[in-house]
């Protein structure tokens, strides 16, 4: 930053020190008496070097000589805060006070540096105070963390925290942030117990607050960042691939667990002769929660909640039970989707065979009439069959099958037919 009609960058250091020391003495001589009237406001046109060095030296003098006045100036919004034109609210007084102390400590060796170093320190201090005024919750935006790192390591810690906060703001302002968040939440939902899902929804409801905190940092940023675009695209693809791998992992291991449980049930049934459905603890349904609770109480009293072999409690917890129920539902859905086409084909085949085996009602009435008229000997000749084919429009095979089935259905209901057959057999 260049200031016209002021000191140049190459001003000798001894001249800078003498002139600022002269202004320092003039400022101490101009200090008003508390019992006297307030002095007249100083004229705005000051001699060289400039108002920047004067303001810095005034803050340094107030901090070292009179701590009470320094604290009052900080609380009233004076000092460096007014110098940087940062309007901090009353709730941020602690943060602004800490920032002013950090700024005053960092300007102690100011007389041993040139004019460009002074400008750099003011810029870093301004960024730190902006971060302190933006948020009190984020670890990257907390003024305490910035102050601690600056006091221990010079000024690099505050700059690093400030850069981390800006990187987060750039990610939140990126167009791919919503797909990134959705992919991340989808990975979290896999194999999560049903009773734990509301916690994820509650955290998603608070995401707007986080976006609002970092939105102030991303207002003046340039939107074209190829490195950030590539990072966002690759990370979204990575999360989507990770989601598929997690789903496959859960399904395979869940299927193995179900098959192992089925094998254990079969082995137990072969040893005891009792099916799992006949026992009192066959399932973990909601109707048996009371029985499970009573068994758990007895188990806790006898073994203090742990088994002697160190394998943990034998009775599943509520989270494990909800996870088992979710695995059952997912397996049921997968089986339906996998065998849906085969089930539909089998059902259509059964219905088609049923429709093919049934004759129309008008044709069966003709066949039944012939059956009633020839009840004593219900065996049509070839001529009778040819005439029935013409009357009904059926095939000869269908007529033969109908008479065979009809004789089977009425085998014992027609005594005359049975006597005729017996007489023929005797001959």
UniProtKB/Swiss-Prot annotation:
Compositionally skewed regions (Polar residues) per UniProt: 272-284
Subcellular location as annotated: Nucleus
InterPro entries: ELK_dom (IPR005539), HD (IPR001356), Homeodomain-like_sf (IPR009057), KN_HD (IPR008422), KNOX1 (IPR005540), KNOX2 (IPR005541), TALE_homeobox (IPR050224)
A GO-annotated cellular component: nucleus
MF GO annotations: DNA binding
Start and end residues of each ELK domain: 330-350
Biological process annotations from GO: regulation of DNA-templated transcription
DNA-binding region listed in the record: 351-414
Swiss-Prot/TrEMBL keywords: DNA-binding, Homeobox, Nucleus
Keyword Hydrolase: no
Tissue and organ expression note: Maximally expressed in sepals, petals and fully expanded leaves. Also expressed in other flower organs and in developing leaves. Low level expression in stem internodes.
Stretches the record annotates as Disordered: 19-49, 272-291
Family matches, as SMART domains: ELK (SM01188), HOX (SM00389), KNOX1 (SM01255), KNOX2 (SM01256)
Family: Belongs to the TALE/KNOX homeobox family.
Full protein name: Homeobox protein knotted-1-like 3
């Amino acid at each position: 930053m260049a200031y016209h009609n002021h000191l140049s960058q190459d001003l000798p250091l001894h001249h800078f020190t003498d002139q600022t020391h002269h202004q320092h003495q003039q400022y101490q001589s101009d200090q008003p008496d508390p019992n006297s009237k307030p002095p007249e406001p100083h004229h705005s046109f000051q001699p060289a070097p400039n108002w920047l060095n004067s303001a810095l030296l005034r803050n340094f003098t107030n901090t070292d000589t009179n701590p009470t006045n320094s604290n009052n100036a900080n609380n009233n919004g004076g000092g460096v805060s007014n110098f940087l034109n940062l309007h901090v609210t009353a709730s941020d007084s602690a943060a602004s006070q800490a920032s002013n102390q950090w700024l005053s400590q960092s300007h102690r060796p100011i007389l041993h540096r040139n004019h460009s170093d002074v400008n750099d320190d003011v810029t870093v201090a301004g960024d730190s105070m902006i971060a302190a005024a933006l948020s009190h919750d984020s670890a990257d935006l907390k003024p305490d963390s910035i102050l601690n790192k600056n006091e221990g390591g010079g000024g690099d810690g505050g700059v690093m925290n400030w850069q981390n906060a800006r990187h987060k703001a750039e990610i939140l302002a990126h167009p791919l942030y919503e797909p990134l968040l959705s992919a991340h939440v989808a990975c979290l939902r896999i194999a999560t117990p049903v009773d734990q899902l509301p916690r994820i929804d509650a955290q998603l409801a608070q995401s707007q607050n986080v976006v609002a905190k970092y939105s102030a940092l991303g207002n003046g940023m340039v939107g074209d960042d190829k490195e950030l675009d590539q990072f966002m695209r690759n990370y979204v693809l990575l999360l989507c691939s990770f989601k598929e791998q997690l789903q496959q992992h859960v399904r395979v291991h869940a299927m193995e667990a179900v098959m192992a449980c089925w094998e254990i049930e079969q082995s137990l049934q072969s040893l005891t002769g009792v099916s799992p459905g006949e026992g009192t603890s066959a399932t973990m349904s909601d109707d048996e929660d009371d029985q499970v609770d009573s068994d758990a109480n007895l188990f806790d009293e006898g073994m203090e909640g742990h088994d002697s072999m160190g394998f943990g409690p034998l009775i599943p917890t509520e989270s494990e039970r909800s996870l088992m129920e979710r695995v059952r539902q997912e397996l049921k859905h997968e089986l339906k989707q996998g065998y849906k086409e085969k089930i539909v084909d089998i059902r259509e085949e059964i219905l088609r065979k049923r429709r093919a085996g049934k004759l129309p009602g008008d044709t069966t009435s003709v066949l039944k009439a012939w059956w009633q008229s020839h009840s004593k000997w219900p065996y049509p000749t070839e001529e009778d069959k040819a005439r029935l084919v013409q009357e009904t429009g059926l095939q000869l095979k269908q007529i033969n099958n109908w008479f065979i089935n009809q004789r089977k259905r009425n085998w014992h209901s027609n005594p005359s037919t049975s006597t005729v057959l017996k007489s023929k057999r005797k001959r």
